[in-house]
Amino acid sequence: MFLNKIQQRKSGVLLYGITPPKSQTPPEKVVEIAQRTLERLHNLDIDALVVYDVQDESARTTEERPFPFVTALDPFEFSVNHLHTLKISKIIYRPAGKFTKDELAAWLDGLHKHNFYPVFVGVPAPDFKVKTSLTEAYQIWSKNKGTSVIGAVTIPERHAVLKDEDIRIMDKMNSGVSFFVSQCVFDVDFAKKVIEDLSASCIMHGKELPTIIFTITACGSIKTLEFMEWLGIHIPDPLKSELKASENILAKSLEVCIEIAAELIKYCSSKSVPFGFNVESVAIRKEEIEASIFLTNKIGSMLKEAGIRK
């Protein structure tokens, strides 16, 4: 059970991440998409399903977005209305700053009623007028801390520049956050540096390490590669060249993802860090969706072989 694993700081947590259908999708098509999603997930050995809140981040950069932004259905409503037969925990993302305190309180009550767990994220642009701060949002959630858990995001790329991700994580831990889901990892050294510095900071301050969940995503095309970079995901130049030169970029990226997972399993185990993985499936191409299922099963097997996942 996801809640118990996070509360007990058990390693081997395995998540699968999706985005809801586009908001202009006809209702009958939404039902069809949800049914296909359920068919894929019912036999998948995962602890929880992550449902992302899709935001337009164009304002944070002057670079042109490789794919046009399209709004998506509300992740909580999509989960409640269409994914209720999937009897696993749901983790719902939400940008806290876009909502008032009353709106967030009502939303959190709805999540708690359904045994869903929130992950609060920042607003899509630096100049966005914030209605509720993250600190305030965590305070609103805190009434449920005895029977729930709350997550946040961690961005290894940010740590590579600002060198303060360990401090950011510890600040959120002080607000009750017990698990952190990373941005997609393609630079394993960036991810390991966050763990190294966080581990040192926790030891220094006498705190237990939180659960770190690494997001892993296969890349099926050059366009997707460009989009990942636009999102701020760092792909080392040698790896980027290797992927671009590959005859089958999807197959090559799967190899890379498995190598990254193996290295992180070994590293986190050596550091006694509670950890897990979140395999993203945000593409619409059948091949990429099937690749995400393969990757989830593969990483699950790797965790079991290492004696980490039961």
Model-derived regions, located:
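Active-site beta->alpha loop and helix N-cap motifs at the rims of alpha/beta catalytic domains
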Residues: 2-163, 244-248, 252, 282-310
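Conserved, mostly hydrophobic/aromatic
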Residues: 17, 49, 111, 172, ...
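Glycine-enriched alpha-helix->loop->beta-strand junction motifs that scaffold or abut catalytic
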Residues: 45, 86-88, 112-117, 145-147, ...
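Glycine-rich phosphate-binding active-site loops on the catalytic face of alpha/beta enzymes
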Residues: 118-126, 174-190, 240, 277-284
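Ligand/cofactor pocket segment of small-molecule handling proteins
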Residues: 146-187
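Short, conserved beta-strand edge motifs with alternating hydrophobic and charged residues
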Residues: 153, 181-183, 211-217, 280
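Catalytic-face loop-and-helix region of soluble metabolic enzyme cores
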Residues: 207-274
